[in-house]
Amino acid sequence: MNPIVSILNRVNVPKKDKYRILSFPTHESYQTNLAETGHEFILFNRGGGNKIWEEKYKPLPKNTHIFNAITDTEYDIDFVLSQERFGQIQFAQEISKSLRIPIIHLEHIEPQLNNWPQEQFDHMRSFKADINVFITEHNQKSWGINDSVVVKHGIRTDDFNGWTGPADGDVKYVLYIVNGLESRDQFCGFTEWSAVKEKVEKIDPSIKFALVGENPGVSQPISNEKILVSSINKCACYINTSRLSPVPMSLMEAMSCGAPCVSSAKQEIPKIMQNDDVCTNDLDQMAAQIVKICNDKEYAVKIGSHCRNQIVNNYNIGDFVNAWNKIFDLAHEIRIGRVI
């Protein structure tokens, strides 16, 4: 058995009610879900052009704070959570050494094996933490770090709920929530989205495509979650054309709402959706499914119900919180020296 998984199953050191966890602004949606654990998160703003928290994407949770300087003496930090390998984990290692606290590393991305030389991949892979966490099994295998654990995404299914589709007489729109769709084509699939849009509009010109997110000159992000959920709940269909996102959280939130979703079949998405009719890399099939969903409410409800059930049963926030709390308890155990 994976030693990390084995240890997680037997953590029994007295736990703290609340940990103070030092991390960095990385992924607003994921951090918002991490805040559901109830612990205190101190996000260190490294400056120098590094990622900052974007309020336009998500408001800062109440138990999450931004600081420009931090000391263990002042804040009694329990451990550090790193979330990327492009400078963050290296910085976390310096903090770990200075403050003598464990590192948890959470890996969000897939290695770009087609673009990285082998030496670069080997170098990036060499950075490891006391506890290494991946968001999918595919992600874990791609990096080849076996001494690690997988934590599946969790969605707040009570908050992301209530799809009805457009009211009679309203425009039938196909929604995609994405930032930088055109500029991040290799990640988000602007080419595929444009092709599907053209195919759908040729079949049924009454169907429109809408974007939410930071797309200059086209759309803006929605930080108010209730308004965001309302946008999902009123769409006729949700589309995702991502190529390199292991787990597109916006897709999962739309699925949780019960919106009928059509997506590319990349990375972990087929495993999440479990429906080859609407999860495909065939652009003609994607277009045909969108047209059918937009014009057949009974079919749309069927697809949407399946989408929601997949999230409720397999990716709920309760399981996510429990998994992370086990990891935090293990990090605490490592810190006090009972597991090395």
Predicted features along the sequence, with ranges:
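Short alpha-helical segment that forms part of, or immediately flanks, the ligand-binding pocket
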Residues: 229, 251-256, 267-270
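Short hydrophobic beta-strand element within catalytic cores of glycosyltransferases
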Residues: 259-263
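Conserved catalytic-core segment of nucleotide-activated headgroup transferases in glycan assembly
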Residues: 142, 156-218
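A short hydrophobic beta-strand element within the catalytic core of glycosyltransferases
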Residues: 238-239
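Aromatic "clamp/platform" in nucleotide-sugar-dependent glycosyltransferases that forms part
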Residues: 243
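Conserved acidic donor-binding segment of nucleotide-sugar-dependent glycosyltransferases
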Residues: 275-284, 292-297
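Short acidic/histidine- and often glycine-rich active-site loop of Leloir-type glycosyltransferases
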Residues: 265-279
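A charged, aromatic-enriched C-terminal amphipathic alpha-helix characteristic of glycosyltransferases
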Residues: 295-339
